[in-house]
Structures are given as C-alpha cells and as structure tokens.
C-alpha cells in the first residue's frame, strides 16, 4: 500500500526537480548555506511537486489507460480510489505550501503556488488536451523549482531568478518534444495534441533546434550577468553545443525514435550538469553591472 502511495507521486519527477532546486538554492547561497532553510525548501518543494503529480494522475487517468507507458499507473489500475487520491494530493499540497511559507519565505511559497496552478489548473486540466501550446505553458511550471530554490535564499525575484526561469523553461521544450517523438504512437492513441503529432516530426525538429539555441544563450547569461563563474560557462557551452549537434543530426537520421530517445537522455545529462555547476561555481559578487561590462 505504501509503495502505491509513493508511486502515484512520481518519485522520479520529484528527484529531478530537487536537483534543480539544489542548483538554484546553492547558486543564490554563494557558499553560505542556511541548512534549516535548505531542508525546508527541499521538503516543501518535494511535497508541492508530489501533490501536483497526484492531481495530474487523477486528471489523466482516462488518457493514461490509452498509453503504453502509463497504462499501469496506480489510478488506472484502481489500486487507489480516485477520491482518496484527491484527499492525498490536497494534504501534500497544503503541507508543502505551509512549509515553504514558514520555513522559507512567502515569495517561495507564492512561486510554488503559481507553478502548481499552471501545472494542474492550466496545463493538466485544459492545455494538454486541447492545445499544441500545452508544452509551452507546462514548461513554465517545470521551471519553477530552481527559481523557488533561488528565491528561498534571496527573498526577491531578480535578474538571476529570471535567467533561471528562462533556462529551465527553454530546456523543457526540446526535452518534451523528444519524448513526444519517441512516444509518438502513445500520444496519437490518446489524442494528445503535442507538436510532433499535430504538425509533424519535421516541424518538431525545427522547433527543437530553435529552442536549444535559445537555451544555449540563456545558460550563458548566468555568467555574463555575474551570477556564475567561468567553469560553469565552459560546461554550459559544451553541453549546449553537443546537444545542438545531436539535434542537427536529427535531420539526417533514418530512425526518428532512436534519435529522439538519445536527445531526451542527453537533455537530462545537460540540465543535471548545469545544476551541479551552478551549485559549485557561483560568483560571490553577482551584480547587475556585470552584464553591462560584457555588453560594452
């Protein structure tokens, strides 16, 4: 029973989000870590993400049964009653928001609320099922965790927070489109209007390339803005160029599914690498003037 309640929270997604939370938190901490704040932020975000995932499982149970990769989910198989899952999701969310408000700051909590509302209320309930732009809207919620981690420390939404929002939002797009390509038949069977299904895989490849270029530019802004150091810059440039190269090879591939799966796997490597590097190669003297120095 415990295993089922854990599975419905999507532990893999929680873990992936926590890596980005740590990146944002340590970037803002600049080597001076408030451990009680750190713990409250990690647990608070974990609870909110878990809540969102349970709500998503509840909302998607009708389409999950049509998809090969989701047909064995807990709610689809009836291992947890839908009404119970709603109570569970609500309890997780309330606990998470309360912990962020009390243990971090109101800004961190409100950022979590906004990410939650976008994911559950806008993306899961409507956009995912009705619009090709669902992925774009969903990317905003996916970018919330590192921003929450950052703002838990700074207690303000500054240029650094905005850059993190841009990096992680832009990353979500090729990452998600790659999944939609190698899971094309699943999305088609469930009638989910993702870009590769609606516009075609060739169009999706163009979008993937453009978003990776934009992602590359956004990642460099952390150093140009004085928030991260040159070691981070080198890694960011390297993974971005490699990821772009993989995307470009997609135009010549004979097997879109294999190519997309490789692109997806590397997307995880890329964002994890950036999260680690911003955690350890922060700039101790980040200032708005730094960006102007590079520009001029």
From Swiss-Prot:
Converts heme B (protoheme IX) to heme O by substitution of the vinyl group on carbon 2 of heme B porphyrin ring with a hydroxyethyl farnesyl side group. It is found in: Cell inner membrane. It comes from Serratia proteamaculans (strain 568). Keywords: Cell inner membrane, Cell membrane, Heme biosynthesis, Membrane, Transferase, Transmembrane, Transmembrane helix. The chain crosses the membrane at residues 8-28, 35-55, 84-104, 107-127, 132-152, 162-182, 208-228, 229-249, 263-283. Pathway: Porphyrin-containing compound metabolism; heme O biosynthesis; heme O from protoheme: step 1/1. Belongs to the UbiA prenyltransferase family. Protoheme IX farnesyltransferase subfamily. Gene3D superfamilies: UbiA prenyltransferase. This is Protoheme IX farnesyltransferase. One of its GO terms (biological process) is heme O biosynthetic process. HAMAP family: CyoE_CtaB. InterPro entries: Protohaem_IX_farnesylTrfase (IPR006369), UbiA_prenyltransferase (IPR000537), UbiA_prenylTrfase_CS (IPR030470), UbiA_sf (IPR044878). It is a multi-pass membrane protein. It catalyses: heme b + (2E,6E)-farnesyl diphosphate + H2O = Fe(II)-heme o + diphosphate. The keyword Membrane applies. GO terms for molecular function: protoheme IX farnesyltransferase activity. Its EC number is 2.5.1.141. GO terms for cellular component: plasma membrane. The gene is cyoE. Carbon 2 of the heme B porphyrin ring is defined according to the Fischer nomenclature. It is an enzyme of class 2 (transferase). The keyword Transferase applies.
């Amino acid at each position: 029973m415990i295993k089922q309640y854990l599975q419905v929270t999507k532990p893999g997604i929680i873990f992936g989000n926590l890596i980005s939370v740590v990146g944002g938190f340590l970037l803002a901490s600049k080597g001076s870590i408030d451990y009680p704040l750190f713990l409250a932020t990690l647990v608070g975000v974990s609870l909110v993400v878990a809540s969102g995932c349970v709500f998503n499982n509840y909302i998607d149970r009708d389409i999950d049964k049509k998809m090969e990769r989701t047909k064995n989910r807990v709610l689809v198989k009836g291992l947890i009653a839908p009404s119970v899952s709603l109570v569970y999701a609500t309890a997780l969310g309330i606990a998470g928001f309360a912990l962020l408000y009390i243990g971090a700051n109101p800004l961190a909590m409100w950022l979590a609320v906004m990410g939650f509302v976008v994911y559950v209320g806008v993306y899961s309930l409507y956009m995912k099922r009705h619009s090709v732009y669902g992925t774009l809207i969903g990317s905003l919620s996916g970018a919330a965790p590192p921003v929450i981690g950052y703002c838990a420390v700074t207690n303000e939404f500054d240029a650094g927070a905005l850059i993190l929002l841009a990096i992680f939002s832009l990353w979500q797009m090729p990452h998600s489109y790659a999944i939609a390509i190698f899971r094309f038949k699943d999305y088609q069977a469930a009638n989910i209007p993702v870009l590769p299904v609606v516009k075609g895989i060739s169009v999706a490849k163009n979008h993937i390339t453009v978003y990776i270029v934009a992602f590359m530019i956004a990642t460099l802004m952390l150093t140009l803005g004085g928030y991260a150091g040159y070691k981070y810059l080198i890694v960011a440039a390297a993974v971005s160029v490699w990821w772009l190269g993989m995307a470009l090879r997609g135009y010549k591939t004979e097997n879109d599914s294999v190519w997309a799966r490789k692109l997806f796997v590397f997307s995880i490597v890329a964002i994890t690498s950036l999260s680690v590097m911003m955690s350890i190669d922060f700039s101790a003297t980040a200032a708005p003037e730094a960006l102007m120095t590079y520009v001029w």
